[in-house]
């Protein structure tokens, strides 16, 4: 890729500063379906092992990264009036986690577990 092009790859903070709506997802089936690795990378700009640092000036806050996975992804699907937020009248698609990822360290976010998944207001997964 080269250093010049690498400097503009995944320039999340620069995009937000220009008013761009970020939409995050996973690259499943190439990568694990979990968003926790993406959250970690967005807020630390490091690989999962913490050894590589990719342009730290592009770090996001956890709230910004979560918004990219929720409201941003709904916007990218042209469904921001139907999903992406937990408000009356919108689809209730959400997960219940074993920790508050907005208060946890990025390393603890990597270890988060899904306790329940709700799609359209109905539980479709519950941890044993």
Question: What are these model-predicted stretches?
Answer:
Residues 1-107, 112-120:
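His/Asp/Glu-enriched, well-ordered alpha-helical/loop segment
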């Amino acid at each position: 890729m080269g250093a010049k092009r690498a400097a503009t790859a995944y320039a999340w903070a620069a995009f937000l500063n220009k008013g761009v709506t970020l939409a995050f997802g996973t690259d499943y089936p190439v990568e694990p379906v979990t968003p926790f690795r993406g959250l970690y990378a967005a807020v630390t700009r490091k690989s999962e092992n913490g050894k590589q640092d990719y342009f730290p000036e592009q770090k996001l806050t956890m709230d910004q990264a979560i918004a990219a996975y929720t409201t941003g992804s709904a916007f990218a699907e042209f469904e921001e009036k139907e999903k992406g937020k937990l408000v009356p009248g919108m689809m209730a698609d959400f997960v219940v986690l074993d920790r508050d990822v907005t208060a946890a360290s990025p390393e603890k976010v990597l270890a988060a577990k899904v306790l329940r998944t709700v799609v359209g207001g109905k539980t479709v997964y519950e941890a044993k």
